[in-house]
């Protein structure tokens, strides 16, 4: 039987000093012996997805204490990828995931907390906390800040829904006036919450539902809606119950590793493929699986991508559909329900809120539930009022969207495509694999033959695209932007947005050892592994080389003889210290980023740190 960890600091004569310090935080005699629950918040005024979280930690804390626990709140950092985009700030985004995971580990282990509620929301915060939960393996419940409402404005005489990506695209499109660009800018992000499409933040919050670590609705109910408050309150009660089940009943199904098994990771990836989630989720699921000791690899993702259809298309893949529309269609539980009916889900896995995922679906899937309360929950609608206040409105749609033939969520009999929304490609350009969000690729370019136009940084590629260097038929290759080469594996949202604004979105491809924002669409292939900085073939590509991208057959290759590529490799290695480095790029890299680069693995392994790489150099 496991022992409450907190008793290390609260029991015994020799812990008088520690108890004295606990008392200084407000604990009383009756609190010693209760489970100490860490409330891991991520409030910051820098990020719209987190700006409303300030008081929500204490909301959860009050519920924990009402349920018989002791709550102690602390905060992590949170980077806004949209604000960090397009400049050297993006170098810090992915490495911040590791810092978040470490900071949670440090705080929880230093103070011997028994369990935790993770209040996350945006791109690297949910993954960082997820990695920490798997690493620590103490009871944990995730509750996110929720998606923002989609923006709306009149552009060129028509009312349209908007998000962050629209602001980027129209700003680079010279057919829009300054006034029209400003109208889009002012309307694109109207409320608090994570950006309104199926971008990385919302994708990850949805995946916590499939993993079994969050409550139904966590990925889809709006940040502004009063219904979201119930998730925070319930999380506080639930975590105390989970702690008691683990420490008093030795119930492994109350722990993250007991819940997030290999089958649960497959469920999460199947959901991601079905909903056309962000390609970044591949990195984060691989990383979390490693922390959990689960052997989940690119081979598993490739296998799943070949059998799971695309059942949902959300912005950026479908610009008029946002998370509020997914929620109206039954949210993540509805997508999981469709997968389960088709035999594409292991519903026997436990969750934090139900004995099994099957039990959860019986109540929460609108295709099978008889609960009017559940149906009312999924009618939660946007309020249409700009605000930074959580739970500030209670609007309802008149009905839920149950159309599984032409609605937002489709059945497996009526999918958007029989191939899923994500695919893994292999070939001489990416022997260890690379990722493409097929849900965002036009059918006309699923097979693409073009010529390489090579850039050794995102900045150079942006200049080339805006300067007219890139033409129809080009494959824009951006290299030395991987985890080691960047370092930090920048997102390439600006290059893909500018290709769209130049009318090249369906006429060009983009291939990189970097990654893409969840807001990216088009023939955008990232995570090329091995990356240029570790000797990957992408470092040997030259402008003018023929490139084949064949998504149906999962192939990406440089169509050159092996002897030509071998000669280039020999020439590269002859450069000595200058080998596998960008020849013309000037970039200041801080000691913090150099430390990350020294330890990180490539994208095929989740870009996690591997300390043995440093240890081997001693």
Curated annotation (Swiss-Prot):
Pfam family for this entry, one: ILV_EDD_C
Gene Ontology CC annotation, any one: cytosol
Its EC number(s): 4.2.1.9
GO MF entries: 2 iron, 2 sulfur cluster binding; dihydroxy-acid dehydratase activity; magnesium ion binding
Modification type N6-carboxylysine: residues: 124
Cofactor: record remark: Binds 1 [2Fe-2S] cluster per subunit. This cluster acts as a Lewis acid cofactor.
Pathway in which the depicted protein is active: Amino-acid biosynthesis; L-isoleucine biosynthesis; L-isoleucine from 2-oxobutanoate: step 3/4; Amino-acid biosynthesis; L-valine biosynthesis; L-valine from pyruvate: step 3/4
Top-rank EC class of the record's enzyme: lyase
Biological process terms in GO annotation: isoleucine biosynthetic process; L-valine biosynthetic process
The keyword Amino-acid biosynthesis appears for this protein: yes
InterPro entries on file: Dihydro-acid_dehy_C, DihydroxyA_deHydtase, DiOHA_6PGluconate_deHydtase_CS, ILV_EDD_C, ILV_EDD_N, IlvD/EDD_N
Sequence similarity: Belongs to the IlvD/Edd family.
Protein's UniProt name: Dihydroxy-acid dehydratase
Gene: ilvD
